[in-house]
Amino acid sequence: ALGQGHTAAKVPEVLFDWIDSGNRLTRTDERYSPEAFDRCRRAHLLDGPLAGKTEVDMWGAGQAGKPWLSWLLAKGFTVRHVVEVSPKKIGTKIHDTPVISDTDLPPPDGTPLIIAVGAAGARELIETDLAQKGYTPGKDAWFVC
């Protein structure tokens, strides 16, 4: 669907709620593992926003971001830089990829920005930062966590 111009977004209000028990199939079956969901996300990225691209930017050099960075590099993408807010990581390299500050993120230029940050509350902060820089989630930037 993303490859056909459709977009995905998180809505601000609860649309449906149900009781979640620990014995649900989605909690016990391997088909619903985090790895299975990552495979699904990756397939949709390759068919959608990454189709025909050779370069990509990334946001997130932590536990959630490093596996995505490794995957992108293994798939042959050139990752121009990884955006990070941790002062310890800014100015270093991870897998030979420069780590830059969020304040150094350039405006959108057609290069997909993949965002892999799992910290609670980070998504909202990143969305605000992206909007100020002219990015539109689902058009210029994609959250994968």
Show which residues each predicted segment covers.
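Short, solvent-exposed loop/turn segments at secondary-structure junctions
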Residues: L15-F16, N23, A61-G65, G118-A122
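Conserved beta-strand elements of the Class I
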Residues: A9, E55-W59, I114
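A short, conserved alpha-helix in the catalytic core of glycosyltransferases
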Residues: A1-E13, I19
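Glycine-rich adenosine-cofactor-binding loop
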Residues: K53-L73
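C-terminal, non-catalytic tails of nucleotide-sugar-dependent glycosyltransferases
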Residues: T7-A8, N23-E55
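Phosphate-bearing ligand-interacting subdomains
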Residues: P87-C145
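Short glycine-/acidic-enriched loop or helix-start segments at secondary-structure transitions
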Residues: D20, P67-S70, E124-E127
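Short internal beta-strands
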Residues: R80-V85
